[in-house]
Structure formats: structure tokens, C-alpha cells
Amino acid sequence: MATFRFVVADVFTDAREIPEERLQPLAREINFSETVYVYPAAGDGHALMRIFTPSGELPFAGHPILGTAVVLAGPLQLEEIRLETGRGIVPVRLEREGPRIVFGWMQQPVPVWEPFEPAEELCRLLGATPTDLPLELYRQGPGHVLVELGSPDEVAALSPDFGSLARFMDEGAACFAHDGDHWKLRVFVPAYGVPEDPATGSAAGPLALHLARHGRIGFGDEIEIRQGVEIGRPSTLHAVARSEEEIEVGGSAIVVARGEFRLP
């Protein structure tokens, strides 16, 4: 049973005094899917952020960007915050009810994509039987191979060989199926020290684009994505591909704790 039945990221709002060599060990010790270190802006953004998983740094990841936007923009009453990332400036548009932020939409970097050639081996390691939709690798910072299965029950039943999967590929495997009024998604990223990710914005945007490119939805159609159920951390994201060059992902976040972290 997860301690928190939601997706957790931690944000160091001023990381200037944390030595560079401590960033990765600290993220590994905290062991959340992502740890964010915030610095003064270097360019035209409001702040610069660096994102670490337990095993490495990412140039971009959706879930921690939304969380960081809520943490930083909340007290400032901003309607939009521009965050500098390894993939450039990411604008996050915020929706409020009174002083409280209830939702955020981020403009995502445009991914590049290509066919994933060792598809048969990946499906063997996942224990998955794909549909006829092509397996394609999308890179938006971290890469994800999108794998459609025939039903949400098949997605729920997946039990990958994580050790072999981590040795086989550096990217994540994003397995999905249509489930009534939404899409069910599970994302496995053992190479980054995250066997299963509870919420993956950097896969949600590419999923909307993938579905639109292959005619499963129309460009401009908003989809709801549910993820994290099997690991006790259910999440909901929304995504829309307005074109191949314009992708937005949205979700909600709240601050559940504040405090000081004292480094020895």
C-alpha cells in the first residue's frame, strides 16, 4: 500500500547552495520518481529547473514541471509561469478557483519519432501482445516506445521482466489501451531507476500525437489518460495534439508538505 495515494515529486525551491556533486545522490536517497532543483532564471523564464530521477538527470519531464509550476506560481498569483528546462522554456498556463490553482496546461517540446525496430523483443520482455498499431519511439527528452494493447485488462495484467528490460533499452515502454471515455496507460522505465512511473507527462503528449497521427483520434481532440492504478498511485492527465508541432498536457497538483532539508 502506497503511503500517498497520489503522485509525489519534491521541489527544492532554491538549490544554489546544494553542491553539484550532491544533486544525484540526494535524488537517489529521496527516491521519488523525480526530484526538482530550482535556480534563478538564466534567460527569459521565471526560473530554471533541473530534474533528476533516482538514477540520472532528465532534460524534460511533464509531471515535475506541473508540480514545480504550482509550487512557484501559487504565492505569486501568476496566470502563466515560464520554466527553463533542458529542452528550452516550457510555458505553463494556470487555472484558479479564487487563490487556489486547480489545473495547469503545459506547452510541451515537439517530440521526434521513429519506428522501433526491435519491437518483437520488447513485447517479449513486456509479456505483451500488441495491436497492429506500429510501435514507435518518441523522444521529448526522455524517450518512450508506445505500445498499444487490445484491452485495458491486458494493460493491467502486464508484469515485465524489469532487469532484462533495463538492460535491453534506455527508454521507457508506454503501454496503453482505449478504455471507454479515457485511455489506460502504464509506463515502465527501469533504466532510470523507476520500474513503473505513476504519472508521465512526457509520454502523455506523445500518446495524443501518436493517436492523432494514426487516425485513432483527430488533431485537436483532448484525451484523458489514467495511470498508476496498479502501483497504488492513481493519476489523471489530459493531453491534446493540435498539430504535429503543438502539443499540450494538463493536470492538477497540490502542495502536501513544506519544510527544510538539512544536508550533513
Named regions from a protein language model:
Residues M1-F60, L66-P264:
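Active-site proximal loop and beta-alpha junction motif in alpha/beta enzyme cores
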